[in-house]
Amino acid sequence: MKNIIIASLILVFTSNSLFAQRLKNSSSSTIGYIESGRVKSSNGATIGYIQDGRVKNSSGTTIGYFDTNRIRNSSGTTIGYFEDNRVKNASSSIIWYVEDGIVKSSSGSTFGYFEGVRRIEAVLYFFFFFY
């Protein structure tokens, strides 16, 4: 199993621990991280957290969750899923995949990578909206 990132509208963090797992883009700039159960932006501001399998924003509102390999929004609508180390949208089109630790778009171009992730024991998801 490998680490996966959905980019553009959603970033998904996968890690085995909660200590400063950094998400970097293809230019090696840190664009976010998870630390002690908090999801933080690259400047260290807390923008959300994970609690009881729910993804919550900094106000405590549930904005998404993970359910049987499906990524769902807070209304329960499937917006994507994981299959064979591929991240697919609700229409089953491949959005992103991981190859040798590098996160690539469906066209094969490099998007970014994870730093500090050793092995997967727990899966943590947080949804960032950049647009």
What does each of the following model-derived ranges do?
Residues 2-6, 12, 16-38, 43-46, ...:
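Long terminal segments
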